[in-house]
Amino acid sequence: MSGIIERIMDLAGLLERIAGMLTGLSMVILLTGCQSLGAELPESFDEERMEEEALRAIGYFNEKDYQSVLDMGCTEFQEFLTAEEFAEQCDPILDKRGKFREIVKTVSMGCKNEEGEVEYGGLVLVADYEDGRICFHITINENMELMEFLVQ
């Protein structure tokens, strides 16, 4: 009987991991704001302020304060994912990488939606941690709200 219970628990754990992966994939699909990458940041964006906002979001991420990351986002970003779901996806990454050291590379770019009507600012930031690196892909709208916060 206990063998059956163990198998059921193993299956439940597997289903939970699959659900987490699907949540992450859905987040990527829904929140991808950069459909058309450009070489230059749109003139309406302040690159310095955009980087400050991205660094603030990464700071919250490093503190595992996922609700604050969500609060920095646009309405769609905030409605799509809960802080608990964010934690399920990101805690293992942070636990594996260890303590944050520094941002080693930042690249900014311009983005447009599929229709080419709305411009966004995109950032790719590479961060060193004790046990590896994390690459952040962050998209910000003209109101300096997060449209996308992806972690690799």
Regions found by a protein language model. Name each.
Residues 1-32:
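Sec-dependent bacterial lipoprotein signal peptides
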Residues 32, 101-104, 147:
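A short, local hydrophobic-aromatic micro-motif
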Residues 33-63:
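Short, low-complexity N-terminal intrinsically disordered segments enriched in polar/charged residues
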Residues 67-116:
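Short solvent-exposed beta->alpha transition segments
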